[in-house]
Every structure is written in C-alpha cells, then in structure tokens.
Curated annotation (Swiss-Prot):
It is found in: Nucleus. The lineage of its organism: Eukaryota, Metazoa, Chordata, Craniata, Vertebrata. Residues 32-51 have a biased composition (Basic and acidic residues). The keyword Nucleus applies. This is Homeobox protein Hox-C4. It comes from Mus musculus (Mouse).
Length: 264
C-alpha cells in the first residue's frame, strides 16, 4: 500500500543527478589509466588471498623408494609405513619371498610391475597320512576269494582257510581248557591270531564234532532207536512166571493121576 501511494502521488519528484561525465569534467574523480585499476585489483586480490589461505610449508624432499615383495611381513609382524618406523626392529625375522625390484633413477619414468611371487604350496605328509584309515591285519578279509565282475550268479564260494601252525596250536590250547567260547573271549582270540570271529566260531564247531567222534559219543541231535533183535530177549526176561506154567502144563496126565492116588 505504501508503494502504491507513492506511485499514485503526482506530487512526487524524481531526484535528478548529474551524469558521470560532469563529475569527471569538474575534477571530482581523478582520472587514472586502466592499468592502474588493474594493478591495484590484482595486488589487493593477492593480499586477501594470502591472509585467508597461508602458503603451505615447504615439503622435504625424500628419495622415492619402490616397495616390492620384500616389504611383505609375516603374519605376526606389521607393515612399516614412512621413515618414522624404518628404525623399528621386530624380534621375528621376515624372510624375503622373492628378489626386490630395481630402483628407478627418474620419477618421470613409469615404475616396472613387481614380479609375481611364486610361492609353492607346502606339502603336509602327516595330514595326508592321517586321513587314510588304518587297516589292521585282522580287518582284512583273507578268507574271501576274489569276485569276478562278469559273474552274475549268487554269492561267490568261500575258499578254505589255511591256518598256520601257531594259530592251530593256540586254538588247540584254548579248546583243551574251554570247549565253548564266550563272545568276549572269541573277540580276544580273533585279535591275537589275526582271524575273524566267524573263523574262530567255525573252527570250534568242527573241533567239537571231531572230539565227539573220537570218543564215540552219541549225537545229541538224533534220537537213537532200540535194535530189532533185543525185543524178544527183553520180553522173556520180563515174564519168567509164564514160562514155568507152560512147562508144568506140558507134564503127562498119568503122573498127575499117580500123585492123586498117593495123596489119598
């Protein structure tokens, strides 16, 4: 509203100022060459720039070094950065992995690429041997014959086990004391003689059958029937009174009559 009232008021008079040329003619403003203004502006600009941003201190010139694979440290050591840590010594000695790269004389020339460090993979024979399972002699199946891949029939026939003299001697000693083995004792003998439990079990079964045959003992699995010739003898021995009656009846009747007369 105030601005509109000023614009609508017709009595407002615009101030009139003389042009700049009159100021220069009346020597209000001294005349200077354009070089003067340029020099002052540049000097003032530099002066303010120096006050706001002081110049950085001069950097010391150090010889440039190119680090190669020799600067690599072990897992327990830390890398050395800058000249401050150059004099620090670690107790562990770092072993260089490859040859250091040559230092370049000029900084403008491109630095050569560091050589590739070819570190061979360490071999651990102990770890490889530990992964392989240990197979004991008693775990090997020596009593099973080799299987033919072209054989399409049933289970291959087992070959006969050939016991050594030492094995047979130990088995005979055990059979002399115990004809029947427990499971625990069978496992102990199998481990000591490098045989399987099945082999020990079968050997003792065969040895018991042989012992019964040598001592002429009847087989407990089959019942023995009485022989046919022994039946009449047993019957005659069981009934002795019947034979006496039969002999008395065989006497003649005349003798019986004579005995009756004498009794009268």
């Amino acid at each position: 509203m105030i601005m509109s009232s000023y614009l609508m008021d017709s009595n407002y008079i615009d101030p009139k100022f003389p042009p700049c040329e009159e100021y220069s003619q009346n020597s209000y403003i001294p005349e200077h060459s354009p070089e003067y203004y340029g020099r002052t502006r540049e000097s003032g600009f530099q002066h303010h720039h120096q006050e706001l941003y002081p110049p950085p201190p001069p950097r010391p010139s150090y010889p440039e070094r190119q680090y190669s694979c020799t600067s690599l440290q072990g897992p327990g050591n830390s890398r050395a950065h800058g000249p401050a840590q150059a004099g620090h010594h670690h107790p562990e000695k770092s072993q260089p992995l490859c040859e250091p790269a040559p230092l370049s004389g000029t900084s403008a020339s491109p630095s050569p690429a560091p050589p590739a460090c070819s570190q061979p993979a360490p071999d651990h024979p102990s770890s490889a041997a530990s992964k392989q399972p240990i197979v004991y002699p008693w775990m090997k199946k020596i009593h099973v014959s080799t299987v033919n891949p072209n054989y399409n029939g049933g289970e291959p026939k087992r070959s006969r086990t050939a016991y050594t003299r030492q094995q047979v001697l130990e088995l005979e000693k055990e059979f002399h004391y115990n004809r029947y083995l427990t499971r625990r004792r069978r496992i102990e003998i199998a481990h000591s003689l490098c045989l399987s439990e099945r082999q020990i079990k079968i050997w003792f079964q065969n040895r018991r059958m042989k012992w019964k045959k040598d001592h002429r003992l009847p087989n407990t699995k089959v019942r023995s029937a009485p022989p046919a010739g022994a039946a009449p003898s047993t019957l005659s021995a069981a009934t002795p009174g019947t034979s006496e009656d039969h002999s008395q009846s065989a006497t003649p009747p005349e003798q019986q009559r004579a005995e009756d007369i004498t009794r009268l």
